[in-house]
Every structure is written in structure tokens, then in C-alpha cells.
Amino acid sequence: WMKLAVHELRAAVAHVQADELSPCFKILARVKQVQRMLFEQWAVLETLTPSEYVQFRNVLGAASGFQSHQFRMIEFYFGNKDARSIGVFANHEVEYAELQRLLNAPSLYDEFLIYLARHGFDVPAESVNRDWSQPYTPQPGVIQVFKQIYDNPHEHWDAYEMCEKLVDVEEQFSLWRFRHVKTVERIIGFKTGTGGSSGVPF
């Protein structure tokens, strides 16, 4: 499912770069459904009790979600950038290069802001000319742009619909992360995660 999400997000970025928002609506609707599938998979893990989990915990060794380059790609497409997160892939040339490229490229949201700037919206320069490897910092001027779009949805329909689709996938991603935390909390409490993370606090 993550491979499909990566494929779709890559396509969405290409369409925004080409000033084609309408294909993104179907693409992001599909990404949302993929996210729902991933969300529901936690239900299986939630059936594990701590005592059941500890029976095979040692088999996992140091295996961790940290090792999923596709998940990291999804995070980068969504704008959750952290250069430290790709160090684990340093010995995997193809994956590392791909993640380096995404780390230093605009996220899907960044590309949308660039699109809005190209189409005459007064997007602050610091939102479209910045270090893409850093997480996005909210700007009051961007809020005003979105207010303009939402005050006149029929005049800016494609931009309006794109905003809604981005909110959809952001919401699903937040729900997935929350369920991840609650599942970890339920099964291992506040113990160290398999990859050496601080577990729930992480």
C-alpha cells in the first residue's frame, strides 16, 4: 500500500508542477483510501496483549519502522522533513539517493504554494523560496491566501478543491500516527521501541 501511495504522490507533484490540479483530486482521493487501509491494519496489532507480544519480541531484533524508506518518502512528500531520519539508509545507495532528493525538493504542499504564486496569489516569498530540507513554517500571508480562496470558492474552484484534498490526506496521516502511538502505548507502554527509539514519547 505504501508503494502505491508513493506512486500516487509522485504523480500528484508532477501534475501540480505542470499546472494541472484537477487530476490531483482523484489521485489524492485514492491516497486517502490507501491511508484508511493502513489505519485499519493497526486493528490487528491492537489484539496483542503485552504478554503475547513479549513472546516474539526477541525475534524482531532491531527491526523497526525506521527502516521503511517508502514510509519516509511519504513523510517527505507530506512535508515532514528531518535530515537525521535518512541516516539509517546510508548503506543503501538507491534508497538513500531517492530520500536525499525528496528531502531537498519541495513537498506536495510546497508545490501547491508555488502553483498559487504562479497564478497570481500573494504567497509570501519566504514560503516559496526557502530551504526545502526544513519543515514548513506557517506564514500569516499564506493564511490570507487561503481565506481569499475560501471566500470565493467558485472563482478559485480548482485551488479550493485542492485545499480540501490536502486537508483530507493530512487528517488521515495524523489519525494514522495517533493510532500508531496508542497501539505502541497499549502493547509496550513506555518501554524502548525495537529500533531504539524512546517508544511512545518518540
Regions from the language model: what does each represent?
Residues 1-202:
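Surface-exposed peri-terminal alpha-helical interaction modules
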